[in-house]
Design a protein with these regions (language model features):
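C-terminal catalytic core of tyrosine-transesterase DNA break-rejoin enzymes
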Residues: 159
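Conserved acidic, metal-coordinating active-site core of Asp-based
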Residues: 22-24, 28, 32-146, 150-155
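Short, well-ordered beta-strand core segments
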Residues: 162-164
Length: 166
């Protein structure tokens, strides 16, 4: 939910996760044996830094994971998303239940077999790319987008040339 101009460091757009939904999302995730995490300036913040899927997120992004007692109580800063991590066998069902429970409140997509992204409503890659193209005076016909996750489908469809990678 955040777009930063890499040249200037200026934040062009920031969509903050609704603070009133942090605890309900974390409670729901825990109920289904899924681990919520978010990020601060130092890396990942989670209730179980030893969770193998938390470790995978840390490895992918080359950042450390810090364990806290209670994630919702710990979050005292604006966040852009909560990432839910868990067993790939369970995640399609959990994603479906989350989409039902938080319909009209959050955007929810699986980005990998073991990751569910929960973001402010309307936040998705295609909307962000549309904003960037508009700022550049361009349209989707000028965009090539490649993606390899379920959360990439809207972006791939939006682009003039969309490529789904295996």
């Amino acid at each position: 939910g955040k777009i930063i101009d890499c040249k200037t460091g200026e934040t062009l757009v920031q969509h903050e996760f609704p603070p009133e939904l942090i605890d309900p999302v974390c409670t729901f995730a825990r109920y289904w044996n899924v681990m919520p995490l978010t990020y601060d300036a130092k890396g990942i913040v989670t209730e179980d830094a030893a969770n193998p899927y938390v470790g995978e997120e840390a490895r992918i992004n080359k950042i450390p994971a810090r364990q806290v007692e209670n994630l919702p109580a710990e979050i005292q800063w604006p966040i852009n998303k909560l990432l839910l991590v868990g067993d790939p066998v369970d995640m399609p069902h959990v994603e479906e239940l989350m989409q039902q429970k938080f319909a009209g409140k959050l955007s929810i997509y699986r980005s990998a077999p073991f990751f569910i992204e929960t973001m402010p409503l309307g936040v998705e890659k295609s909307a962000s790319l549309a904003l960037l193209l508009k700022n550049m005076g361009l349209g989707p016909e000028n965009l090539m987008a490649c993606g390899d996750g379920w959360n990439d489908l809207p972006m791939i469809r939006y682009a003039g040339m969309g490529v789904a990678m295996g």
